Amino acid sequence: MKRFVLLIMAICLIAPNVEAQNKQLERKLKQEYKTKMKEYKKEGWKLFGSSHSLDVALLTHYDKLKSLGEDGREVLGIASRFKSKNVGKQMAINNACVTYAQQAGSYVKGRVVSDMAGDGVDADAEFDNFYAAYERLVEKEIKGELSESYCIIHDNGDGTFEMQAYFIVSESAATKARIRALENAAKESAAAQRYAEKVSEFVREGFETE
């Protein structure tokens, strides 16, 4: 009975905190929406590949992020100065995957250097091959986890265009993708195999996408 009462008390304490966090997230997303719409209209961006209005697409985007809560991540892909819109779209998709992979690789490298160098590990020499392999494999694995949200295009006025493609990824799914990349990258690195448990811990940690 005592445990039950303690459990109820814990739930009562946690619930208001979760609700406050959700409201804070909602306010943040609303502000981002207003800022983005103002920016897009000012710079002449148009929605690409959708029958919806840009306003609706952006509202839907932030609604998806809100529903995912802390598990939702936005990933941006950029393509510049292209003439074929289809080619530009593929460039933006590839850029999103490459950007995410580079951020994932940089995060793990930073953690290895800061946490393991003090243990006498020569991070640069021992992990050099691993970093490159890990980024390459994350780029491959994350592509299947990115869900396209909306895409905008800008006419440069000289026959070329700029494109920004926005994707949403679930952090839990992204973590699994990074783990798959780690498992394969470790095959190319004796150091990653030797320190597998520690490196796996770094890979599982989330990081802020830019």
Predicted regions span which residues?
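Sec-dependent N-terminal signal peptides
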Residues: 4-13
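N-terminal signal peptide c-region/cleavage motif recognized by signal peptidases
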Residues: 15-17
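Domain-level marker for long, solvent-exposed, non-transmembrane regions
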Residues: 20-210
